[in-house]
C-alpha cells in the first residue's frame, strides 16, 4: 500500500494527469524524494517536478515516450551502473521506469542521498558561460 506524504499541489496536479501506471510511478518517486530530500524545495520547473537545494536543481522526473525518467543533475558523478549518462557537457544521469515494479527503492534512496552529497553548480552555469563546477 502506498502512503503519500504531504506534497505540493503543483506536483500533485502533475502526477494526476499521468496514465494510471505512470501516476503510480510518479507517486512512488514523489513519496521517496520528499522523505529523503527533507532539506530540498520541490516545485514544477520547466513543466516537471524538480527538487532544489539552495536554488540548485538536484533531482526530478518527467514523462518521456519510453516511460517516466528520473534524472539527477549531478548523477554522472555518482558512479552507479544503473544510471544512464547520455551527454558529455553536463553531469546528469537518469533512469527510465516503465512500470512501478521497476523502481528499486534501495537504489533510489542511495541515489537520492548521493544527490545531496554530490552537487554541481547548475545555478550559476550561465554566469560561468557554460562551465560546470562541483559544489560538493
Residue ranges and their predicted role:
Residues 1-136:
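Charge-dense, helix-prone N-terminal extensions
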Amino acid at each position: 500500500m502506498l502512503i503519500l506524504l504531504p506534497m505540493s499541489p503543483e506536483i500533485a496536479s502533475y502526477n494526476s494527469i499521468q496514465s494510471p501506471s505512470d501516476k503510480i510511478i510518479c507517486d512512488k518517486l514523489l513519496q521517496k524524494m520528499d522523505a529523503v530530500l527533507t532539506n530540498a524545495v520541490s516545485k514544477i520547473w520547466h513543466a516537471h517536478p524538480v527538487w532544489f537545494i539552495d536554488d540548485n536543481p538536484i533531482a526530478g522526473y518527467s514523462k518521456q515516450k519510453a516511460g517516466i525518467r528520473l534524472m539527477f543533475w549531478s548523477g554522472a558523478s555518482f558512479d552507479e551502473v544503473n544510471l544512464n549518462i547520455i551527454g558529455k557537457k553536463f553531469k546528469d544521469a537518469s533512469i527510465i521506469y516503465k512500470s512501478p515494479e521497476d523502481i528499486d527503492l534501495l537504489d533510489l534512496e542511495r541515489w537520492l542521498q548521493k544527490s545531496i552529497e554530490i552537487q554541481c553548480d547548475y545555478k550559476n552555469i550561465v554566469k560561468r558561460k557554460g562551465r560546470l563546477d562541483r559544489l560538493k
